[in-house]
């Protein structure tokens, strides 16, 4: 049977999310002079349906995606293809970052794709321990990958930041994620060259994740920062944050002890017959006793830390691309440290202010604590998960820091706090702030918890999902309709200014949406079908006006197979619920399609009385079973306007195109559909995340560089001899064993 026909039969309903996201290729494509580890030359992408590439395409589009880990389960017939979340516990966004660069600079020859994994020092540690030193091996724990001896991986799989310093010809490029130092990559070779700041410049998220009692500090500590730092090309400064907090709950720390107790009870109820066939192993007994004592010490120490409010901290960091980073601790006006309860996934920057936000991407420390991955513990783990888990905060707490306060002779700065109703993961700020008024563009992810993912424990053994594989690892879908907002804040008085109707909701009874917004129905009620799950965004860089006029958003839609009963119960009584929870259940079962739209933000001077500042002016709805993601604006060469390039998934990876395509739209006419679609039999994405565009690329010439050995040596010297030798053999020289035979080579 034709595979594409078979795929269409299985994916009749929009509620079937594309299974092509379940697999990803870890192959690196590139020129050997740029990347000696590249397995193949750059891919020349194919154009579908005999279409032509738009002649105005130019420059280079960069896309980032998590691509599994060195020990991810691979396909039987192709070891390069892995299934990162097949264990039923690991989210898609736990994995090595793969950089994809699409070159549109020579359209006569075609579009070429170069890829490379972002290989930080901890990557080489991960690769070497996996094959050569299993006692130090890294394992997946929730969003993180961790070794009990070496610490936390910095996987760099979320975002980019272009930086154009006035004294340099080419743009430089940072690669980022929420829990690791940003790294600069070479835009031509895609190599991860250097971190920003020395390891000792960055404070660990929590003392527990930097140093355990009676043990040396981890070589790789957990650092929480922002996946979206900012760059001011007018002043040549990059801004980001370094934040941390005390332990979120004491209950979470009981998980290992509870499992130990359950295991003891199980062994008493069901003693092994083999246990009576020989005398007890005294050495093994004392090892277990010592381990239990050590665990008790750790537990008591963790309890003390959970009550230490001074473990909460936020630093604003600035960097000029050449010298040591500068940092300032941010406090409330009363001098108390700021406590970020979730994350600082994104920050904003204006000409006079740094805007910080406690964003709705919750990071729970309890996710990383060890839990047995065994069927007999599934019910226990489900009970513990429901006990520990909590919904994201329903409001957006914002902290405003004046840039003129960031002086070299001070160590602390004061922030003013503003709270905006409804939660936010992504937001943008206008650069101009006339009269100290800051304009924020927010996508309210109402009851959409992107930090929750589909797990094996969410399903019963009898649930066969219609013969399709479960969407393990995928972010759960939205549980209420979303809202777009544009707000003006008075930075001096730290309050919101009411200037016009500036929030767009898809609930007709609340606010009649503009005429473009088509509807979906349930129980005779109509709702806008476009505003479900604002995921990722794109925009034209540096608008001359200094404020955003159009922002392109990809919306998730609703899908039955990424709906969980646990998530539904957690958000059933959501504070700002717009659509009754039972109706959301019905809408999700029916399915709401993914879409790409253009949100227009009107100038305040052009508005009439009671007119909404926000308007959906153009939109494209993807076909049933298709999911569009990661939009990027590309300016048109030699003219105005531009294009939107995005990733589109459909079907399964058994199709000739692996169910992965690159679609190109006219940015001024989304509704007419893609101008062309690109594909290749070897193009196999995981879930893509953020993007960027550069007009040109070039070999990195900046002198800033932090050597690996000098960066980590102060920590490695405190380690046992085994770990010191391990770093000398594998991490410092950036060596990666290809098979177990390489382990004996020194």
Predicted feature descriptions by range:
Residues 1-746:
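Beta-propeller domains
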């Amino acid at each position: 049977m034709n595979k594409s026909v078979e795929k269409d039969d299985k994916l009749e309903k929009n509620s079937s999310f594309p299974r092509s996201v379940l697999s990803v290729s870890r192959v690196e494509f590139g020129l050997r002079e740029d990347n000696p580890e590249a397995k193949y030359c750059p891919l020349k992408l194919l154009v579908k349906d005999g279409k032509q590439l738009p002649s105005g395409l130019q420059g280079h589009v960069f896309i980032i995606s998590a691509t599994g880990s060195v020990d991810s389960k691979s396909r039987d017939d192709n070891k390069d293809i892995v299934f990162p979340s097949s264990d039923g516990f690991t989210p898609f966004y736990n994995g090595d970052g793969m950089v994809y660069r699409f070159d549109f600079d020579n359209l006569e020859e075609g579009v070429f794709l170069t890829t490379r994994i972002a290989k930080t020092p901890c990557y080489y540690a991960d690769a070497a321990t996996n094959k050569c030193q299993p006692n130090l091996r890294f394992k997946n724990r929730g969003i993180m990958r961790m070794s009990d001896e070496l610490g936390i991986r910095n996987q760099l799989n979320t975002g980019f930041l272009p930086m154009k310093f006035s004294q340099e010809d080419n743009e430089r490029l940072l690669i980022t994620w929420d829990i690791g130092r940003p790294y600069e990559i070479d835009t031509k070779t895609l190599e991860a060259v250097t971190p920003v700041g020395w390891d000792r410049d960055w404070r660990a998220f929590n003392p527990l994740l930097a140093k355990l009692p009676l043990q040396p500090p981890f070589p790789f500590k957990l650092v929480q920062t922002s996946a979206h730092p900012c760059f001011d090309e007018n002043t040549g400064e990059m801004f980001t944050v370094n934040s941390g907090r005390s332990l979120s709950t004491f209950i979470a720390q009981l998980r290992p002890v509870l499992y130990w107790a359950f295991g003891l009870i199980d062994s008493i109820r069901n003693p092994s017959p083999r246990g009576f066939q020989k005398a007890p192993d005294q050495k093994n007994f004392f090892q277990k006793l010592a381990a239990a004592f050590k665990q008790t010490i750790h537990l008591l120490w963790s309890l003390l830390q959970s009550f230490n409010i001074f473990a909460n901290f936020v630093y604003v960091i600035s960097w000029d691309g050449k010298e040591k980073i500068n940092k300032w601790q941010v406090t409330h006006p009363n001098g108390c440290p700021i406590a970020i309860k979730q994350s600082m996934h994104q920050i904003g920057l204006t000409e006079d202010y740094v805007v910080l936000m406690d964003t709705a991407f919750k990071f729970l420390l309890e996710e990383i604590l060890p839990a047995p991955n065994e069927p007999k513990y599934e019910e226990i783990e489900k009970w513990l998960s429901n006990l520990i888990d909590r919904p994201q905060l329903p409001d957006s707490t914002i902290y405003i820091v004046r840039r003129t306060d960031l002086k070299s002779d001070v160590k602390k700065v004061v922030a003013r706090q503003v709270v905006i109703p409804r939660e936010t993961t992504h937001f943008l700020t206008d650069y101009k702030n006339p009269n100290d008024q800051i304009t924020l563009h927010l996508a309210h992810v109402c009851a959409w918890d992107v930090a929750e993912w589909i797990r094996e424990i969410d399903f019963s053994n009898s649930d066969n999902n219609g013969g399709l594989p479960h969407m393990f690892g995928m972010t759960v879908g939205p549980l209420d309709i979303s809202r777009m907002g544009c707000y003006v804040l008075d930075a001096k008085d730290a309050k919101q200014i009411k200037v016009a109707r500036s929030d767009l909701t898809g609930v007709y009874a609340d606010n009649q949406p503009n005429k473009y917004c088509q509807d979906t129905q349930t129980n005779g009620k109509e709702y806008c079908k476009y505003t479900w799950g604002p995921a990722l965004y794109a925009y034209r860089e540096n608008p001359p006006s200094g404020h955003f006029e159009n922002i392109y958003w990809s919306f998730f839609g609703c899908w039955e197979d990424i709906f969980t009963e646990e998530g539904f119960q957690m958000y059933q009584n959501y504070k700002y619920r717009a659509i009754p929870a039972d109706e959301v259940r019905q809408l999700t079962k029916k399915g709401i399609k993914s879409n790409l739209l253009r949100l227009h933000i009107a100038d305040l001077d052009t508005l009439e009385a009671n007119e909404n500042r926000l308007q959906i002016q153009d939109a494209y709805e993807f076909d049933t079973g298709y999911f569009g993601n990661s939009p990027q604006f590309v300016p048109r060469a030699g003219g105005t306007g531009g294009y939107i390039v995005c990733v589109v998934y459909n079907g399964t990876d058994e199709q000739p195109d692996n169910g992965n395509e690159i679609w190109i739209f006219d940015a001024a006419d989304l509704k007419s559909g893609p101008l062309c679609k690109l594909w290749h039999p070897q193009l196999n994405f995981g879930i893509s995340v953020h993007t960027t565009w550069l007009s040109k690329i070039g070999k990195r010439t900046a002198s800033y560089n932090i050597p690996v050995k000098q960066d980590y040596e102060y920590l490695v010297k405190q380690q046992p001899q085994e770990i010191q030798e391990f770093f000398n053999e594998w991490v410092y020289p950036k060596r990666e064993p290809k098979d177990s035979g390489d382990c004996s080579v020194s």
